[in-house]
Design a protein with these regions (language model features):
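Intrinsically disordered, low-complexity regions
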Residues: 6, 14-17, 80, 110
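Serine-hydrolase catalytic core recognition
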Residues: 30-174
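Conserved beta-strand positions in repeat-built beta-propeller and related beta-rich domains
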Residues: 1-2, 46
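Structural motif
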Residues: 3-11, 50-57
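Short loop/turn segments that connect beta-strands within beta-propeller blades
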Residues: 12-15, 60-61
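A short beta-strand motif characteristic of beta-propeller blades
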Residues: 18-23
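Compositionally biased, low-complexity repeat tracts
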Residues: 1, 9-12, 88, 152
């Protein structure tokens, strides 16, 4: 969902399919760690900018997940927030980006910021836990930006192809 992980339980019924969201952390990357076609149970791996990889157990009959195990936190994320915005590229396309910063950060351009982006080989750049960035950069009141530029795999083949060959300049514009 706009580069933000979502997990849904889909259930077939007489009138079609119904969906119910699974309550997991926002602004995260969610992966299925284990599942079976013989069971309604699954394990999910969840990681975000402010939380290390965590294993969650869930059952489709009761989509309230249970935390099983988490990697240790390597920096203090208290007082930090993650927001997602969109910038407008040179051709009018909306380019999503995440910004991780102190909750009380002044939005006046004065906060030192590391910005990263990668638009190539259909590789998506999704939220991930970076202990060194957190410890040495975010804990000192600085901010971090991840831009989801074209050429990557965040929105499928068309997003990737929009930055290929003669259209390569567009990823720099993004």
């Amino acid at each position: 969902d706009n580069v933000r992980g979502r997990e849904m339980v889909l259930t077939p019924g007489a009138a079609g399919w119904t969906s119910k969201a699974v309550d997991l952390p926002d602004n995260a990357t969610i992966s299925i760690a284990s599942a079976s076609d013989k069971s309604d149970k699954a394990y999910l791996s969840v990681a975000g900018f402010l939380a290390p990889t965590t294993l969650w157990a869930m059952d489709a009959a009761n989509p309230a997940p249970t935390q099983v195990k988490a990697m240790p936190a390597r920096f203090d994320a208290d007082g930090l927030v993650v927001e997602q915005f969109e910038a407008t590229s040179s051709d009018g396309t909306k380019i999503p980006y995440f910004i991780v910063h102190a909750r009380d950060m002044k939005k006046d351009g004065s906060t030192p910021t590391i910005m990263t982006a990668y638009g190539g080989f259909e590789i998506p750049m999704t939220p991930s836990y970076a202990a060194i960035t957190g410890k040495l950069w975010l804990e000192r009141g600085n901010s971090f930006v991840l831009a989801n530029i074209r050429g990557g795999g965040e929105f499928g083949p068309a997003w990737h192809e929009a930055g290929l060959k003669t259209k390569r300049q567009i990823i720099y514009d993004d």
